C-alpha cells in the first residue's frame, strides 16, 4: 500500500483503478469514484467489495485506506481520535488524490464518519452507502448499551487474552465460520492484524463513538445526497431496526435494504448481496 503523510498521521491506501479507461483517475478527474471507510478492528473488511467481482470497478475508481491506528497507518496525536478527526483525514486523502467528489461507503463506525463527512463537506459527497452504521451518540441509553456489550471483550483483551477476545468478536460480527471466510476472501494475516488493531478500536474509537453527537438539524441543513442503508436482519439484533428508523427520521431520502440472516460485518459474510444492492442503487438513481 502507498502512504500519505498528514500533520499528525500517516495513512496507507490503495487505489483500485476502474477497468474502464474512460473512468480512470488522472488529469481529467471524473466523479466516478468510491471511497471505502472501514469499521472497527478489521481494517480490510471492505476489501471484498472490490475483489469479489468487477461489478463496481467496471465504472468506478475505488479508494481503500486504513484509518489512524490500523495496519501501518500511524496516529501521532496523544489524545483520543475523534469522529471529526477521521472526517478531516478522509477529506485530506481525497484532496491529496484529487478526488473532488465520491460515493462514500462506510461500514459501522466508518458509516458514522461518512455521515459526518457529508454534513461538514457536502460538496465532496455524491452519495452515502451506509453498511450497518454505528450511529450511537444520538441516544444516551442506547449508546451506553452498545458500549456495555463490548466491556467483557475489552477486559479479556486487556488481560492478555487477545486472540480469545477477538475470536468472540469475530463470531458475533461475522459468524462461527469466520475463520473460513477470512481465509478465503480477506488478505493474508487479517486475523493477526485485527488482534493488534483492536486496541485502537477498544481504547480510542469506542470513546469517540460515545462522545459523537448528530442531530436532525445537521442532517436537514447539509445532507441532501441519495442515501443507501444496508442492514442485516437477525432475531437477536434489534439495534439495526432502530437505526433504520433513526436514519429515516434524519434523512427521509434514505433507502433501506435488508439482508436476511446477515451479521454486522455483512460485507464479509454476504458480499454478493451487498455488491448487488450497491449496483442496483446506482442504477435506480439517475442522478448517480
Region spans (language model):
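Conserved HGGG/HGGXW glycine-rich cap/lid loop of the alpha/beta-hydrolase fold
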Residues: 8-75, 93
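Conserved acidic catalytic loop of the alpha/beta-hydrolase fold
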Residues: 84-102
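Short beta-strand immediately N-terminal to the catalytic nucleophile in serine-hydrolase-like folds
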Residues: 104-106, 131
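Gly/Ala-rich beta-loop-alpha elbow adjacent to hydrolase catalytic centers
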Residues: 106, 110, 114
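Conserved alpha/beta-hydrolase catalytic His-Asp/Glu region
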Residues: 161-203
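Conserved serine/cysteine hydrolase catalytic core
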Residues: 191-249, 255-258
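Catalytic histidine-centered segment of alpha/beta-hydrolase-like enzymes
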Residues: 259-271
Amino acid at each position: 500500500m502507498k502512504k500519505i503523510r498528514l500533520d499528525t498521521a500517516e495513512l496507507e491506501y490503495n487505489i483500485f483503478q476502474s477497468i474502464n479507461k474512460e473512468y480512470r483517475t488522472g488529469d481529467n478527474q471524473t466523479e466516478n469514484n468510491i471511497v471505502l471507510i472501514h469499521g472497527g478492528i478489521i481494517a480490510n473488511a471492505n476489501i471484498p467489495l472490490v475483489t469479489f467481482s468487477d461489478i463496481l470497478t467496471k465504472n468506478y475508481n475505488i479508494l481503500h485506506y486504513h484509518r489512524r491506528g490500523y495496519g501501518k497507518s500511524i496516529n501521532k496525536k496523544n489524545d483520543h481520535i475523534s469522529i471529526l478527526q477521521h472526517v478531516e483525514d478522509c477529506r485530506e486523502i481525497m484532496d491529496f488524490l484529487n478526488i473532488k467528489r465520491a460515493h462514500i461507503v462506510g461500514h459501522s463506525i466508518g458509516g458514522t464518519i461518512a455521515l459526518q463527512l457529508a454534513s461538514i463537506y457536502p460538496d465532496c459527497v455524491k452519495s452515502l452507502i451506509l453498511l450497518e452504521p454505528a450511529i450511537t451518540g444520538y441516544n444516551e441509553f442506547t449508546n451506553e448499551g452498545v458500549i456495555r456489550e463490548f466491556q467483557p471483550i475489552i477486559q479479556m483483551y486487556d488481560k492478555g487474552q487477545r486472540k480469545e477476545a477477538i475470536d468472540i468478536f469475530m463470531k458475533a460480527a461475522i459468524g462461527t465460520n469466520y475463520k473460513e471466510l477470512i481465509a478465503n476472501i480477506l488478505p493474508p494475516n487479517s486475523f493477526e492484524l485485527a488482534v493488534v488493531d483492536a486496541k485502537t478500536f477498544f481504547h480510542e474509537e469506542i470513546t469517540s463513538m460515545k462522545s459523537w453527537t448528530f442531530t436532525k438539524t445537521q442532517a436537514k441543513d447539509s445532507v441532501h445526497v441519495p442515501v443507501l442503508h444496508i442492514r442485516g436482519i437477525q432475531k437477536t439484533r434489534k439495534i439495526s431496526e432502530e437505526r433504520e428508523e433513526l436514519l429515516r427520521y434524519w434523512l427521509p431520502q434514505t433507502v433501506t435494504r435488508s439482508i436476511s440472516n446477515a451479521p454486522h460485518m455483512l460485507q464479509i459474510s454476504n458480499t454478493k448481496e451487498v455488491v448487488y444492492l450497491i449496483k442496483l442503487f446506482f442504477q435506480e438513481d439517475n442522478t448517480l
